[in-house]
């Protein structure tokens, strides 16, 4: 009997899942995508920001030019505080000059459309396929795993990748299988570690002239942050994040209606955005909007047997730092590199169950610290923007405006340290930031400078308030 080809089952036609499909195609790996919805491309009122670390991988896959044409990158950020102070940060422009990729804001729907339209074989994507259960076969067989959907269909493969978001069914099945194995089981404390402290109203408006493309506006309040990003064709992307009354567990996180969202937005209706324009003018021209809880968590255990979860199913962040999708794209790069390496080492022989298990543990081990750094920065940025606590209020109001580019070095270093596909050329690698900000001993000196400067400013502010 001839050997079946190595096959990956991707659960979720998300940005993460579709990017993985493109990457697997580049290394000649067979795959199938199971999407629970009837359509991949849907309007949910959401936008997405592609930063240089995500952009570079998408560029390697030949997808970025279309994305770039669909976006109007911001050049500056105008940041306003409750006491009337404001400053202009050239952070977006510096990012572009450093890495060759701007912050590309576009509709999430448009990004999904690009990823779907460019799939080499759309028959590999199956819609209306909700996963019911997953089984594994460690004792050998044609394939390592079998995925069954609620309509009774069965799909077999050697590796199952959960790219199905924060409410991941793949993750639950992985936990179920792990719990029945003497070598597995994820601690209950880890399973229940997702929490919610913030919510967000996000939306898209169109048809309002008078906003300058490239000039994003952030208004910082106590416990609340409003971000407005004007784009091309008079599109405006906006976000209103709010600290909740308490910290919730994932299982009892609040759910919101459109009426709840409208009530939140009306509270900042008179917020000035540009000359003669208030947020209520943006609200009146809304096309779509929604309100959701912002889950936060970084799971430590990403795989069991031939099953692995990536993206929001393993690391869910708030929106403020903008790295959620970009971090997921990095997951794709690291996992694809390891799969390609294993296939080359096996020289045509199909990897065994044990091979896949070892590969996934290695993926978890080598990538977790990188994701942890991004997650921790995202956690901090959300709370600085919300002025959550005295120290974080001081950092946002008195440190960030005065340290300028020094404050940019840490997020820039995170971008420079990003994973990329090691089997495809690196475009735009000549831009200075990829080498200048890459972690090295000099980075310690920069951190010491930043901490000393921040300490001096904090001490000065505390003296004023004393």
Swiss-Prot record:
Keywords: FAD, Flavoprotein, Glycoprotein, Membrane, Monooxygenase, Oxidoreductase, Signal, Transmembrane, Transmembrane helix
GO molecular function, one term: FAD binding
GO cellular component terms given for this protein: membrane
Cofactor requirement: FAD
Localization annotation: Membrane
Use case: Diterpenoid pyrones display various biological activities and FDDP E shows anti-HIV activity. FDDP D and FDDP E show also inhibitory activity of 42-mer-amyloid beta aggregation that is involved in the pathogenesis of Alzheimer's disease.
EC number(s) on file: 1.-.-.-
UniProt-annotated glycosylation sites, renumbered to this chain: 128, 192, 376
Pathway(s) where this gene product acts: Secondary metabolite biosynthesis; terpenoid biosynthesis
Alphabetical GO biological process terms: terpenoid biosynthetic process
InterPro entries: FAD-bd, FAD/NAD-bd_sf, FAD_mOase_fung
Membrane topology: Single-pass membrane protein
Record-linked Pfam families: FAD_binding_3
Residues the entry annotates as binding FAD: 35, 49, 108, 312, 325
TM segment ranges: 443-465
First and last residue of the signal peptide: 1-23
Chief subcellular location: membrane
Family: Belongs to the paxM FAD-dependent monooxygenase family.
PANTHER family: FAD-BINDING DOMAIN-CONTAINING PROTEIN-RELATED, FAD-DEPENDENT MONOOXYGENASE ASQG-RELATED
Stated role: FAD-dependent monooxygenase; part of the gene cluster that mediates the biosynthesis of diterpenoid pyrones. The first step of the pathway is the synthesis of the alpha-pyrone moiety by the polyketide synthase dpfgA via condensation of one acetyl-CoA starter unit with 3 malonyl-CoA units and 2 methylations. The alpha-pyrone is then combined with geranylgeranyl pyrophosphate (GGPP) formed by the GGPP synthase dpfgD through the action of the prenyltransferase dpfgC to yield a linear alpha-pyrone diterpenoid.
Protein name as catalogued: FAD-dependent monooxygenase dpfgE
Species for this entry: Gibberella zeae (strain ATCC MYA-4620 / CBS 123657 / FGSC 9075 / NRRL 31084 / PH-1)
Designated gene of the protein: dpfgE
